[in-house]
Swiss-Prot record:
Protein's recorded name: Syncytin-2
Biological process, per Gene Ontology: myoblast fusion; syncytium formation; syncytium formation by plasma membrane fusion
Positions bearing the site annotation: Cleavage: 350-351
One annotated Gene Ontology cellular component of this protein: plasma membrane
Family: Belongs to the gamma type-C retroviral envelope protein family. HERV class-I FRD env subfamily.
Lineage, uppermost ranks: Eukaryota, Metazoa, Chordata, Craniata, Vertebrata
Gene that this polypeptide is encoded by: ERVFRD-1
Region of interest: Fusion peptide: 354-374
Extracellular-facing ranges: 16-478
Length: 538
């Protein structure tokens, strides 16, 4: 069960305080206040971080498909038929890698972040990849997709090198092919998507300039003033406002559609030279995976969301934003907050689902590396306990600061009281001058300090439990590492002490019987037979 986060939205004056640890608090209150919600102050905001808790996904708009940036990760494997040519092949590989300055050469960690997502609305664009032996990441139904691009990912593309072409840029001899439903592309071209992004290297194989009449309008996603264009050469999308100039926005280095299509195929490198012989020799294959670089955006594939798509992926995916299961409740309700343990937080009966929380929250922006099932449960719980202990420390420090401010205010009030008594000394003091009862404020800071001390002790206890819970196992394994080899001799010695006397008696009896048999056999062989005495008839 995931940990439930509960945040109390306080009064507007306190909630306006910007705290780096609570961006959700600030964003949620801004959204509630802008919509005129009665729950903009004094309420509970609850969310679940469990990967199995239903969440809500919102598809990205067509314009966001042109602005969300992706990145590529490259890995390679040697051809199994390559023998005795590793040295020149390594030289060629280092040359080819120099042509990929904008590609990360360390593969990411793959896997779904959430597995129970409900898509709200219709996705304007979906990408379908079909491959016989690919990695299935999930499939969206066709009813939730406005336009579906189908990628022909069963092709195997090769780049051939000769000796004098070792330093030429690698590129797909045939780019991944995309098919569309009939009537999707209109015969309306534009020069808006000409050129290349200035922030990217021009040596990458997919950054070839678009030819004329190859940047076509997508009918289902365009209007009279706003066009969504497809560059079929680079498999990139562009958004153009016909009422404005050409230089409207900077195109991302790697677009989402380009990354998704490139990740469905791999580039094979072959060579012909005096090193490899006159025939075509396959050397290695590049496997390219893609990830979303824009913070807060995810691939939505079926009911799963992913931060990265592996090479040779299959399924039907779109991009969008995700929020976990969120609900709000009035602040006068009593919500139990577990300090330590794995008991789930019960859902409040009067809770209201907080659906309008959109992409600006960025709740899941930091979960791209995270991935379920990588760490051990015991380590996770110990880290969780440490985090809770740290939160208690932070809360104790906040209470200490508030108490210091109250003490300072009380000192100022008492000082003013003494000053007024001095000014009204002739009338007997301020109380007699006002003809009112004289009241004094009893400072409760001692009780507050005791409570803070208890919180700090509880945090220390939690931290020790978390540390000992993990380190005890680690220490036990250290003892096992040298005690375990002594277990065999100790067990053997114990068995010998238990059954040794019995075995010794059995061996003694066996030896004695054998000696008696040998002695009898010796007597018989020496002719010492007993005489047969016949009885006399008389």
């Amino acid at each position: 069960m995931g940990l439930l986060l509960l945040v109390l939205i306080l009064t507007p004056s306190l909630a306006a305080y910007r705290h780096p640890d609570f961006p959700l608090l600030e964003k949620a209150q801004q959204l509630l206040q802008s919509t005129g919600s009665p729950y903009s102050t004094n309420c509970w905001l609850c969310t679940s971080s469990s990967t199995e808790t239903p969440g809500t996904a919102y598809p990205a708009s067509p314009r966001e498909w042109t602005s969300i940036e992706a990145e590529l990760h490259i890995s390679y494997r040697w051809d199994p038929n390559l023998k005795g040519l590793m040295r020149p092949a390594n030289s060629l590989l280092s040359t080819v890698k120099q042509d990929f300055p904008d590609i990360r050469q360390k593969p990411p960690i793959f896997g779904p972040i959430f597995t129970n997502i409900n898509l709200m609305g219709i996705a304007p664009i979906c990408v379908m990849a079909k491959r016989k032996n690919g990695t299935n990441v999930g499939t969206l139904p066709s009813t939730v997709c406005n336009v579906t691009f189908t990628v022909d990912s069963n092709q195997q593309t090769y780049q051939t090198y000769t000796h004098n072409q070792f330093r030429h840029q690698p590129r797909f001899p045939k780019p991944p092919n995309i098919t569309f439903p009939q009537g999707t592309l209109l015969d309306k071209s534009s020069r808006f998507c000409q050129g290349r992004p200035s922030s990217c290297s021009t040596r990458n194989f997919w950054f070839r300039p678009a030819d004329y009449n190859q940047c076509l309008q997508i009918s289902n996603l365009s209007s009279t003033a706003e066009w969504v264009l497809l560059d079929q050469t680079r498999n990139s999308l562009f958004w153009e406002n016909k009422t404005k100039g050409a230089n409207q926005s900077q195109t991302p280095c790697v677009q989402v559609l380009a990354g998704m299509t490139i990740a469905t195929s791999y580039l094979g490198i072959s060579a012909v030279s005096e090193f490899f012989g006159t025939s075509l020799t396959p050397l290695f294959h590049f496997h390219i995976s893609t990830c979303l670089k824009t913070q807060g955006a995810f691939y939505i594939c079926g009911q799963s969301i992913h931060q990265c798509l592996p090479s040779n992926w299959t399924g039907t995916c779109t991009i969008g934003y995700v929020t976990p299961d969120i609900f709000i409740a009035p602040g006068n309700l009593s919500l139990p907050i577990p300090i330590y343990g794995n008991s789930p937080l019960p859902r409040v009966r009067r809770a209201i689902h907080f659906i309008p929380l959109l992409a600006g929250l960025g709740i899941l922006a930091g979960t791209g590396t995270g991935i379920a099932g990588i760490t051990k449960a015991s380590l996770t719980y110990s880290q969780l306990s440490k985090e809770i202990a740290n939160n208690i420390d932070t809360m104790a420090k906040a209470l200490t600061t508030m108490q210091e401010q109250i003490d300072s205010l009380a000192a100022v009030v008492l000082q003013n009281r003494r000053g007024l008594d001095m000014l009204t000394a002739a009338q007997g003091g301020i109380c007699l001058a006002l003809d009112e009862k004289c009241c004094f404020w009893v400072n409760q800071s001692g009780k507050v300090q005791d409570n803070i001390r208890q919180l700090l002790n509880q945090a220390s206890s939690l931290r020790e439990r978390a540390t000992q819970g993990w380190l005890n196992w680690e220490g036990t394994w250290k003892w096992f590492s040298w005690v375990l080899p002594l277990t065999g001799p100790l067990v053997s010695l114990l068995l010998l002490l238990l059954f040794g006397p019995c075995l010794l008696n059995l061996i003694t009896q066996f030896v004695s019987s054998r000696l008696q048999a040998i002695k009898l056999q010796t007597n018989l062989s020496a002719g010492r037979h007993p005489r047969n005495i016949q009885e006399s008839p008389f």
